Curated annotation (Swiss-Prot):
<feature type="disulfide bond">
    <location>
        <begin position="386"/>
        <end position="572"/>
    </location>
</feature>
<keyword id="KW-0732">Signal</keyword>
<feature type="region of interest" description="Disordered">
    <location>
        <begin position="330"/>
        <end position="353"/>
    </location>
</feature>
<keyword id="KW-0175">Coiled coil</keyword>
<comment type="subunit">
    <text>Homodimer.</text>
</comment>
<feature type="signal peptide">
    <location>
        <begin position="1"/>
        <end position="20"/>
    </location>
</feature>
<feature type="region of interest" description="Disordered">
    <location>
        <begin position="211"/>
        <end position="265"/>
    </location>
</feature>
<feature type="domain" description="Olfactomedin-like">
    <location>
        <begin position="385"/>
        <end position="642"/>
    </location>
</feature>
<protein>
    <recommendedName>
        <fullName>Olfactomedin-like protein 2A</fullName>
    </recommendedName>
</protein>
<feature type="coiled-coil region">
    <location>
        <begin position="150"/>
        <end position="176"/>
    </location>
</feature>
<dbReference type="Pfam" id="PF02191">
    <property type="entry name" value="OLF"/>
</dbReference>
<dbReference type="GO" id="GO:0005576">
    <property type="term" value="C:extracellular region"/>
</dbReference>
<dbReference type="InterPro" id="IPR003112">
    <property type="entry name" value="Olfac-like_dom"/>
</dbReference>
<keyword id="KW-1015">Disulfide bond</keyword>
<keyword id="KW-0964">Secreted</keyword>
<dbReference type="InterPro" id="IPR050605">
    <property type="entry name" value="Olfactomedin-like_domain"/>
</dbReference>
<feature type="compositionally biased region" description="Basic and acidic residues">
    <location>
        <begin position="221"/>
        <end position="249"/>
    </location>
</feature>
Length: 642
């Protein structure tokens, strides 16, 4: 092999030398053609001398046909062509004349040329069978190496498949563990609420009527004014410390206390907050679990008194704070009161009741509380406001031009104010809040939320003070509390068909889309129809806004195929889909009614004003559609069937 390498190197060196020599002697390209003009077609025709003609010319016997020519053929209105060829390519005699000149002028170069000829003959006279055998050996080695690599890759693929299966199993276990942790957290919170509610039976057993701080400040006693503020309570009146005598017929009964008389003093009453707790059935019987508590704070010694108001609250735990203006009330002078006392004997039982009271007027104090309603109404806007089927969608009205081509803007239909929330682009972690539409048009944002996990798509909604979105590149949906700024709920959609590849191009609509209508919160996502066509169809499901749970009885598989529509929205429990998003003249071409489980083709015109609509959401409070079209924010008024 060493000889072959050196031989090849020497041959390459000599070849390059000869090439350089030919350039020195003026041997250039055979034919060179140049053309000029805008409309030009050129053709060169070369007629060289033959070897016989060359020998005749050299011998002096030249004929008429012994000549060489280079003809130029051109065509076109604006054309200029020229063809040139070196004499060596047209006249073979030139090569012989060059050799003779080289012998005379440079004998060393002639020797070099002869050496090159010798090397070329040696190269072609070698045993090519040996080279062929070496090549076969190399090919067999390459085949063996390829088979070995395939075997190793197969093993590695099997190992990777097993690893992926193990990881998926671990993920399923982790999901189960996360559900268990959520249930444990709920149980712990329930236990905490029960511990808070346990004070009511204990206070009842101790006969303190929920008065806090009475042991520390014995002079602050509950008077008739306090009892008027808590008329609906079922707890017994508190016992004071000073005893008094009582008359009995058959035996002596322990005396009942009478509060000390006090002079009227003006005291401000400030209701700091109202807290609602969930009531159990047994605790309802004890009149303690469903109470609303208010703390009354007086100016003297900071004594706190607890007012318990009976109520039947069966909803989930609702904790609300309420502000109230402080009022002045006169502390009444307590009057002696003899509480009912029962005397017993062997034959008769006599009950003596003596009550002396003085009417005292107090200023009216109003507690303005707002209760969200029963559990069945937590996911509803207002059932009575549902208009029914769409008759038409009016022309869009442009509100503002803001942000990038893709995005979403929305309002909370439950909120009383007109705050606007914007997500610019279809991937990110920022939610921008504007106080109203005027501030949005001026670009004056009032709040900026950075969610802990990135959102993707434009199918987000804001509902009941929370931001609902799809976590990027996952099947998870998240509820982000805007007031507390933390993730309040997290759920995995098991049957969703999700493309986990990086979608750096807008595909027409979001994979997971939220919607809000008169009945509450919905989620729209693609799933595989394993029962019939094995195709990917759109599924709509009612969501519990508290924990994002999904029930089978409120989940419907529609006949709408994935990637066959532009955008969709839900009104009054009916899913509507627009056929295109990137054409101005669109149409609502599909509707699915969850009440009757039927589908139809409404064929209602829908205008994509700027031919790139990335979001359409319905606002049940305003009865309009919010849309983001190529960086423009639009609203559509919806007309319903009368």
């Amino acid at each position: 092999m060493w000889d072959y390498k050196h031989f090849l190197l020497l041959s390459l060196a000599f070849t390059s030398t000869v090439t350089a020599l030919s350039k020195v002697l003026g041997d250039t390209d055979q034919v060179r053609m140049t053309s000029e003009g805008s409309d030009c077609r050129c053709k060169c025709i070369m007629r060289p001398l033959s070897k016989e003609a060359c020998s005749r010319v050299k011998g002096g016997n030249m004929r008429v046909e012994d000549y060489y020519t280079v003809e130029t053929v051109s065509s076109g209105s604006d054309c200029k062509c020229s063809c040139t060829a070196p004499p060596s390519s047209l006249n073979p005699c030139e090569n012989e004349w060059k050799m003779e000149k080289m012998k005379k002028q440079a004998p060393e170069l002639f020797k070099l040329q002869s050496m090159v000829d010798l090397l070329e003959g040696t190269l072609y006279s070698m045993d090519l069978m040996k080279v062929h055998s070496y090549i076969n050996k190399v090919v067999s080695q390459m085949n063996t190496l390829e088979e070995t690599i395939k075997t190793n890759l197969t093993r590695e693929n099997d190992f990777m498949k097993e690893s992926v299966v193990n990881l998926s199993n671990q993920m399923k276990k982790y999901e189960n563990y996360s559900e268990i942790m959520l249930s444990i957290k709920k149980e712990i919170s329930n236990l905490g609420y029960q511990l808070l509610q346990k004070d009511a039976p204990e206070n009842k057993a101790q006969d303190t009527a929920g008065v806090k701080g009475l042991a520390k400040f014995p002079n602050n006693k509950k008077n008739e004014g306090d009892k008027s503020l808590s008329k609906v309570t079922k707890d017994k009146p508190p016992k004071a410390e000073k005893p008094k005598k009582e008359v009995s017929k058959t035996k002596q009964v322990p005396p009942q206390p009478t509060p000390r008389p006090r002079s009227p003093v003006l005291q401000p009453v400030v209701i700091r907050g109202v807290t609602y707790y969930k009531a159990g059935r047994q605790e309802d019987a004890e009149n303690a679990a469903g109470n609303r508590e208010s703390v009354v704070k007086g100016p003297h010694r900071g004594a706190k008194q607890e007012i318990r108001t009976e109520g039947n609250i069966t909803e989930p735990y609702l904790i609300r704070e309420e502000r109230i203006v402080a009022t002045q009330r006169a502390t009444p002078t307590p009057t002696p009161t003899t509480t009912p006392t029962t005397t017993q004997s062997t034959t008769t039982t006599t009950t003596t009741r003596t009550t002396i009271s003085t009417a005292t007027e107090y200023p009216l104090t109003t507690l303005s509380s707002t209760v969200l309603g029963a559990e069945a109404e937590t996911n509803k806007v207002r059932e009575g406001e549902c208009e029914g089927t769409i008759a038409s969608v009016e022309q869009p009205k442009k509100q503002h031009s803001y942000g990038r081509n893709e995005g979403a803007w929305m309002k909370d239909p439950i909120a009383k104010d007109g705050r606007i929330y914007v997500t610019n682009y279809y991937y990110g972690n920022n939610l921008v809040e504007f106080r109203n539409l005027d501030n949005f048009k001026q670009g004056r944002w009032s709040n900026l939320y950075k969610v802990p996990y990135n959102w993707i798509g434009t199918g987000h909604v804001v509902f009941q003070g929370a931001f609902y979105y799809n976590r990027a590149f996952t099947k998870n949906i998240i509820k982000y509390d805007l007031k507390q700024r933390f993730v309040a709920a997290w759920t995995l959609l098991h049957d969703v068909v999700y493309e986990d590849t990086t979608p750096w191009k807008w595909r027409g609509h979001s994979d997971i889309d939220f919607a809000v209508d008169e009945s509450g919160l919905w989620v729209i996502y693609p799933s595989v129809d394993y029962d019939y066509s094995q195709q990917e169809v759109i599924v709509i499901s009612k969501l519990d806004p508290n924990d994002l749970s999904i029930k089978k009885e409120t989940t419907w598989k529609t006949g709408l195929k994935r990637n066959s529509y532009g955008n969709c929205f839900i009104i009054c429990g009916i899913l509507y889909a627009v056929d295109v998003y990137n054409q101005k003249e669109g149409m609502i071409s599909y509707a699915y009614d969850t009440h009757t489980d039927t589908e139809a083709d409404p064929k209602l015109p829908f205008i994509n004003e700027y031919a790139f609509t990335t979001q359409i959401d319905y606002n049940p409070k305003e009865k309009v559609l919010y849309a983001w079209d190529n960086g423009h924010q639009l609203t559509y008024k919806v007309n319903f069937v009368a």
